[in-house]
Amino acid sequence: MSSYRVAQVGAAGAPFEITERTTRRPGPHEVRIAVDACGICHSDAMFVNGALPDVQFPLVTGHEIAGRVAETGDGTGGHWQVGDRVAVGWFGGSCHHCAACRQGDFVVCEELKVPGWSYDGGFGAEVIAPADALARIPTGLSAAEAAPMACAGVTTYNGLRRSPARPGDLVAVLGLGGLGHLGVRFAAAMGFETVAIARGADKAELAEELGAHHYIDSTAGTPVAEALRSLGGARVVLATAANSAAISATVDGLAHRGELVVIGADAEPLTITPAQLLMPGLVVRGHPSGTARDVEDTMAFSVLQGIRPMVETMPLEQANEAYGKMLAGTARFRMVLAHTEAGRAG
């Protein structure tokens, strides 16, 4: 029996430890993936800390997976072949029978499968995933570049393209981290007049490099909403920062019929009153990632526009250090665990 290495968490809040798992064959409608890279998302902390229901320990987290099909199970219909380059993100498969799935809205499936929650994630050299979770990686993206596109990329890209903003509209991106730096790049490439909002004057140069037309320093003294109104008001604010206070502070900067798209997860409540929403007809919407097809669209658009995530790679053995950098906010801008052939063979 062959084996492969994983970085697992033995109990809630425990550090990662390197251990081995026995390779198993994929079941019907599943594929086994040889993982080349896996991004580290802030949402991984919810799994590691046991903050979500039914999280099982020992845990192998990771839902920004890029690799190659190593083996196919029955019923994959010949669509996937050994060697195909694939990505798997937060959308790790759906049930196909709940009300949302029957309406074709698979990403809000009532029994959504998330890697690291429903089955072992990408902090290991192999993953067995449902075939409907697979997105084909296009030529032009490396594994380390493709992995973050399966969650951070698709969430920002989809959040913008499903918003009411149209080319030429003022669109603000709150936060310049793992999601935000991609959000700014996508917004600029989509033809929006792009505003980046972050903390500190030192981020202005980065915002310009990413393609932003304007930069708002949220610590400069002028309220963020006032700064947005001085630019004419935002048609859309894409809130990538996991900070409810910062998200709430943008609402009064929306133009009439504007939309706040929330993708940054924070346990604290938003402080928005009905009065703020009623008169200007504002919309507050949560946006949940995207399907495998959406991931493919994101990657195709990224190749077309020359957009790549800014990543820092580390080997699986340094999972604790890489995860720590993500938590501390010192990553520039997405930590990615890169796997080796040596980690797969036991």
Descriptions of predicted regions:
Residues 254-255:
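Helix-to-beta-strand junctions that scaffold the AdoMet/dcAdoMet cofactor pocket
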Residues 264-280, 292-298:
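Rossmann-fold NAD(P)-binding glycine/threonine-rich loop
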